[in-house]
Amino acid sequence: YPDNGQLPGLVTGAIARQGVYGGATTGEIRPVRIAAGGIGTDGPEDRGLSERCIIGFNAGPPFVPSLYNNNVQIFQSKDTAVLMTEMIHDARIVPLYESLDDLPPLNDDVRLWTGDSKGYWDQDTLVVVTRNFNGLSASFGQAGTSINKVLTERFTRVDEVTVDYEFTVEDPATFSDRFTGCLLYTSPSPRDLRK
């Protein structure tokens, strides 16, 4: 969704920053979202979030593959799931509940870089709903501020080595409509991981 396969348009006033891999950004807006480089050298706040190892350019959420380090590990215990990305070695610890209705809201004053994730099982699919982003990261790509973003991720095991990953981004302050993306994650062989 949407049916045309295109990202919805930005709403009036939504922030869209350029310069993902260096170069100019729009003004001197902080935090600097470019992956490498920055807008100055006076202090760490002038450098990009990826360069500072705060948020990787493909570490999500949502997980969107890019140049390298696209590995994601999923661990599960009785009460939690852990979604760990190789990029930045970020681990989201996701408490698990019985259903969507049981997900307790976090105080709206608490805002986190990767949001507050909570999950539940919908038959064979792990559903993770993330809210309370800090507004300093983008909603998707370089658009938006994430402050109003609600991200819903669905992880469905297809076979022994494949997970179907689907995500839906809802951010009415940035995009004119919600949108959904999906891709398959396959488990690399132990030999591939050693390379």
What are these regions (language model features)?
Residues Y1-S187, R191:
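PEST-like low-complexity, intrinsically disordered acidic/proline/serine-rich tracts
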